[in-house]
Regions:
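One-carbon transfer enzymes
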Residues: 1-236
Length: 236
């Protein structure tokens, strides 16, 4: 079997590659987004704009895997080929951008979903899911790291099943909700005059604290952004 993998996450890429010696009978080709400055071409790992490809490229592969890819899979691809997504959220809750950010804010469940892709965003019948906790002291980064570890755990357990088609597809439990990049961007500016409880402020800051990124900010009297984060520690 020829497998095409799109990923823009170094941790997932390295963890997935560690699984491959168990499947020597298959061929795995890796691609990343050309605008991903964190990656550079290497053996069997190339930059590629998926939307610029067509049937000549698609037909080379029996399976497409999206592992934290920053590219949307074209309708032509998902409608005519087997495409599976490893999504860092618990579908149908908080589909779209940064599920853990919005789960901290709206209290909806978070976790990992492996699903067959269709034309809609983070949508389609589910192969496997795992729900994960969010603790009061967690920032976005804490939850995200927990999600990544669970994704590799599920791939370690089920990659062989994916390759052999040994799974059952379960419909999503409703359509849930979707968050877009614009929804995240709207969270980042902090209005210092906005009324809020301490709990709301803490949740907003921990949802936006994700090292090394600078997300939350307010604007000072000189018109300069002042970035804000939060550190939380539970007593021993």
């Amino acid at each position: 079997m020829n497998i095409c993998i799109f990923t823009d996450n170094a941790y997932i890429y390295e963890g997935f590659c560690a699984l491959l010696p168990r499947f020597p009978e298959h061929t795995f080709d890796f691609f990343y987004s050309p605008w991903n400055a964190a990656f550079s071409p290497r053996e069997n790992f190339w930059p590629l704009r998926l939307k610029e490809q067509g049937p000549e490229f698609y037909d080379r592969y029996d399976l497409f895997l999206s592992l934290h890819s920053k590219q949307l899979f074209p309708d032509e691809l998902v409608e005519n080929h087997l495409c599976i997504n490893v999504h860092p959220g618990l579908n149908p809750h908080n589909r779209g951008w940064f599920p853990q950010v919005f789960s901290i804010l709206n209290g909806l469940p978070v976790g990992v979903t492996i699903h067959r892709m269709d034309r809609e965003l983070d949508h389609g019948p589910i192969l496997w899911q795992a729900e994960l906790p969010i603790y009061p002291q967690d920032t976005s980064k804490d939850v995200y790291d927990r999600i990544l570890a669970k994704e590799l755990e599920l791939l370690d357990k089920h990659l062989g099943d994916i390759l052999t088609g040994s799974y059952t597809l379960t419909p999503m439990a409703g359509e849930g909700n979707i968050n877009y990049k614009a929804d995240f961007d709207a969270l980042c500016p902090i209005d210092l005059n906005e009324p809020a409880t301490y709990g709301q402020v803490i949740d907003r800051l921990r949802a936006l604290t994700h090292a090394p990124y600078q997300n939350a900010y307010f604007v000072d009297e000189d018109g300069k952004k002042v970035y804000v984060g939060i550190t939380l520690r539970k007593e021993d």
